[in-house]
Amino acid sequence: LEGLEQVYVETNQINDYLAYTKTLNKINMQAATSEDSLVYVTAELQYMMGNYEQAAAGLTTYLTSFCPGGRYCMTAQYYAANSYYRLKQYDAAIDQYSALADMAGNPYMEEACIRVAELSYDKKEYRTSLYYFQRLQEVASSSSIRTTAMLGILRCSQNIGDKTSVIETASSLLAVNSLAED
């Protein structure tokens, strides 16, 4: 049965395999407990092979079926977001990266904030972009990422007409640059 499972995983037909195992009463319990892992691993394999359309579909199925509470929700969310981004389906990517940025304890937080901020900016959704640049500034792990966030805040503030924020952010950027030169 393990060999059969592997074939179904590699051919991206995990739903057929799960339906088959449910017809076998003896292993029905085992299939139910491993369904989370099988659905994820199948979608992850598609992602790793660069089949982003199939990966996005499989990961979305996983997220809908098992999250919150699934074993792989955070990584699945990241792979789904990245798949949509690579497919240039930016609205879906924004949705997935936003959901990822809302997850606590997230090792992908910086990338999620950068992606949502930049994609929103490109769509001229400056308030959304501003929000994610501000979040990026809070979680930045390096001074260069903090500077990127501040530049984003400056641009968004300019576009929404928030002169106070423009002045404050520009002053902060100048202070950071003068410290860097020292």
Whereabouts are the PLM-identified features?
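Acidic, polar-rich low-complexity tracts and alpha-helical solenoid repeat scaffolds
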Residues: 1-182
